[in-house]
Structure formats: C-alpha cells, structure tokens
Amino acid sequence: MPDLNKIIEDLSSLTVVEAAELSKQLEEKWGVTAMAAAAPAAAAGGAAEEAKDDFTIMLISAGDKKINVIKEVRAATSLGLKEAKDLVEGAPKEVKSGVNKKDAEEIKAKLEAAGAKVELK
C-alpha cells in the first residue's frame, strides 16, 4: 500500500486547475460523476434542516438572577469570571457554538433554571 502521507502531500500541493483535472479523470476512470452525489443531498435539504447537528446557544437576557446565570455560563464554557460576567451583561450574546443537540438542550435547561432567557440556533 502506498504511503498515505505522501499521497496527502501530493494532493495538497495541487493547484485548483490540477485538482479539477484530477477530479475529471477519476470520474472517467471510476465511471461516476460528482453531480450524482450532490443531488440526493439537495433533495433532502428540508430534512437536513430538521436534523441539524451543530447548535449555537444564544443568551437573550440574564433575567433577575445574573449571578446564577454567570455561574452556569462559566460551567458551560471555559470562560473566566470577568469574561462570563461581560458576556451575561452584554446579552444578547453567543454563549457556545458547534454544540450537539443533546448538550445544547442540557445547557439551555441549566441556563433557564438559573433565570436566563436562551435560544438555540
């Protein structure tokens, strides 16, 4: 089996024109087209919206219990006390992005229990 790192290096050094030519030749050799793979994804666009993987947790407002919200923001992120306080006081702000659905819902529930108004996007 060829050295995969060498193949990766070789592919990384290709220009855009060379990469397009490589793609074209591979399509011919393997008897496939790049468009065929993209068509099912486009048709399932509505379903992809519902099955969203990454969520952004937005703090809309801190509510009356700002200290509790700051504590939960610190627990959900790696922010220090001052950064978490600034985030909470500057609402609406993004608390965390790229979070899976389960974790996003857990963080949202904790922030809401602390008194915050939160949205998932």
UniProtKB/Swiss-Prot annotation:
Family matches, as SUPFAM superfamilies: ClpS-like, Ribosomal protein L7/12, oligomerisation (N-terminal) domain
Similarity comment: Belongs to the bacterial ribosomal protein bL12 family.
One Gene Ontology molecular-function label: mRNA binding
UniProt cross-references to Gene3D superfamilies, sorted A to Z: 3.30.1390.10, Single helix bin
Disulphide bonds in the chain: none
A GO BP annotation: translation
Function, as annotated: Forms part of the ribosomal stalk which helps the ribosome interact with GTP-bound translation factors. Is thus essential for accurate translation.
Keywords noted in UniProt: Ribonucleoprotein, Ribosomal protein
Key word Aminoacyl-tRNA synthetase present: no
Name this polypeptide is given: Large ribosomal subunit protein bL12
Alphabetized HAMAP family for the sequence: Ribosomal_bL12
GO terms for cellular component: cytosolic large ribosomal subunit
Quaternary data: Homodimer. Part of the ribosomal stalk of the 50S ribosomal subunit. Forms a multimeric L10(L12)X complex, where L10 forms an elongated spine to which 2 to 4 L12 dimers bind in a sequential fashion. Binds GTP-bound translation factors.
Pfam families associated with the record: Ribosomal_L12, Ribosomal_L12_N
